Amino acid sequence: MFYWLIELTNTFPSLAMFRGLLNVFRYITFRTGGAVVTGALFVFLFGPWIIDHLRLRQGKGQPIRADGPQSHIISKKGTPTMGGLMILSGLVVSTVLWANPLNPYVWIVLAVTLGFGFVGFYDDYLKVTKQSHSGFAGRARILIEAGIALVACYALVRLGRDPSSTGLAIPFFKDLVIKFGWMYVIFGAFVIVGAGNAVNLTDGLDGLAIVPVMIASASFGLIAYLAGNAVFSDYLQIHYVAGTGELAVLCGAVLGAGLGFLWFNAPPASIFMGDTGSLALGGMLGSIAVAVKHEIVLAVIGGLFVLEAVSVIVQVASFKLTGKRIFKMAPIHHHFEQLGWTEPQIVIRFWIISVMLALVGLSTLKLR
C-alpha cells in the first residue's frame, strides 16, 4: 500500500514537491525494514488481547501428550495454543502495507501461508475442543496441504516462463541444473509440504521453532533480494527470478511478527504457536525457496527442521522394522530432554545450530 505513495506524485502534480521524500518507498530495503517494525509493533500491541481471548475460549488450553516428557504435564498445562494467529495477523498486515500489491509472488506465498495456516488452525481447534492430542486426520491433512502446494507450484512455474523454472540448481556448482520438466511441480510441492511439517515437528519447546524460523526468514529475505536483482544475481552467478526481490518484504514481516511473538513465547510461554503457526511458517519458507530456486539451500539453512523430521521418520521406521527405538523419544529435542538437558539448554543450543546452518547456507551464494 505504501508502495503506491510514489505514484501519487505522478497522478497529482501538486504533490511533486514530495517526490524526493516519497521516493524511498521504491526501495525494497526500506520497505523491508518498515515491514519488520510494523510486524513487531502489531504483535506487541494486539498480542495480549489475542492471548486473553484464546485463554478464555480454550479453557484448559492445549492438551499435553501423556507419552511425552512428564515435566510438560505440569509446566505447560493450561497454556493456550493457536498463537500462530498473532504471527499471521502481523505478517499479513505488515505485508499488505509495505509490499508491492501488484507482485504475484507475494500473493502466491501469502496464499500458501494462509492455506497451511487454516489447516493448522483446524487441527488445533479439534485438539482443543476434544482435549485430545490427535486432531485432523493425518492423511486428509497431507492431501489438503499437497493440493495447496501443487497449485502454488504450478502458478510459480507459469510465472517463470523459462526452462530453468522447472530445474533444480545444485549449490557450489555454477552451471549444474537438474531438469525436471513439469515433474518439478510435484517436486516443489514436496518441498513445501515437507517444510511445513518439519517446522511443525520442531515446535515442541518454548521458543524452539520461532527463532530458527526467523533466522531462515532473514536468510531467505536476503536470497530473494539478490535473486530478484539482475546485477547481483549475475555477479553471484545464481538464478535470476524477476520480481522475487519483493519477497524480502514478506520475510521482513515474518521476522518482525516473530520477534513480537517471541516476547510472549519465551520460557515460560504465555502462548503456544500451535499448528496454526508452525504449518503456515514452514509452508511459507518452502514456497519462497521454490520461488527463488534455492530448494536445496533451504535444507541447509533449515537443517534443524530437517533433523527434527528425520528423527521422527527414523524412529518410526526402526520401531516398525525391528521393534526397537533409536532415540529415547522423538522428535529429537525430546531425546535430549530425556538425557537430562534442561529446556533452555536445548532451545538455545538449537538456536546456535540454526545460526551456523544459516551461515553455511548463505555461503553457497558465493562459492560457485
Swiss-Prot record:
CDD domains given for it?
GT_MraY
Q: Which GO terms describe its molecular function?
A: metal ion binding; phospho-N-acetylmuramoyl-pentapeptide-transferase activity; UDP-N-acetylmuramoyl-L-alanyl-D-glutamyl-meso-2,6-diaminopimelyl-D-alanyl-D-alanine:undecaprenyl-phosphate transferase activity
Q: What is one Pfam family matched by this protein? A: Glycos_transf_4
GO BP annotations listed: cell division; cell wall organization; peptidoglycan biosynthetic process; regulation of cell shape
Q: Which residues cross the membrane?
A: 34-54, 79-99, 102-122, 140-160, 176-196, 207-227, 247-267, 271-291, 296-316, 345-365
Q: In which pathway does it act?
A: Cell wall biogenesis; peptidoglycan biosynthesis
UniProt catalytic activity: UDP-N-acetyl-alpha-D-muramoyl-L-alanyl-gamma-D-glutamyl-meso-2,6-diaminopimeloyl-D-alanyl-D-alanine + di-trans,octa-cis-undecaprenyl phosphate = di-trans,octa-cis-undecaprenyl diphospho-N-acetyl-alpha-D-muramoyl-L-alanyl-D-glutamyl-meso-2,6-diaminopimeloyl-D-alanyl-D-alanine + UMP
Q: What is its main location?
A: membrane
The record's annotation in InterPro entries points to: Glycosyl_transferase_4, PNAcMuramoyl-5peptid_Trfase, PNAcMuramoyl-5peptid_Trfase_CS
Q: Which UniProt keywords apply?
A: Cell cycle, Cell division, Cell inner membrane, Cell membrane, Cell shape, Cell wall biogenesis/degradation, Magnesium, Membrane, Metal-binding, Peptidoglycan synthesis, Transferase, Transmembrane, Transmembrane helix
What is the documented function of this protein? Catalyzes the initial step of the lipid cycle reactions in the biosynthesis of the cell wall peptidoglycan: transfers peptidoglycan precursor phospho-MurNAc-pentapeptide from UDP-MurNAc-pentapeptide onto the lipid carrier undecaprenyl phosphate, yielding undecaprenyl-pyrophosphoryl-MurNAc-pentapeptide, known as lipid I.
Q: Write the protein's name.
A: Phospho-N-acetylmuramoyl-pentapeptide-transferase
Organism, as annotated: Bradyrhizobium sp. (strain BTAi1 / ATCC BAA-1182)
